[in-house]
């Protein structure tokens, strides 16, 4: 398992935390949005430009 930062681009913008976690098999621990640190809820929507702190469960690119 690896901890990483991912820059949210248009692939993930508008998707919920739950959608991204299920699709990519990872856990999102924190969202960095402008000057805010956001603790994600399952229905939190990602915005383009967010940075997410994740732990990957499987092998990812």
Regions from the PLM with identified roles:
Residues 5-61:
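Cytosolic Rossmann-like ligand/nucleotide-binding regulatory domains
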């Amino acid at each position: 398992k690896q901890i990483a930062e991912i820059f949210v681009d248009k692939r993930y913008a508008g998707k919920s935390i739950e959608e991204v976690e299920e699709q990519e098999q990872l856990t999102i621990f924190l969202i960095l949005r402008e000057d805010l640190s956001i603790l994600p809820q399952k229905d939190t929507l990602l915005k383009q430009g967010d940075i997410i702190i994740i732990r990957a469960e499987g092998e990812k690119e």
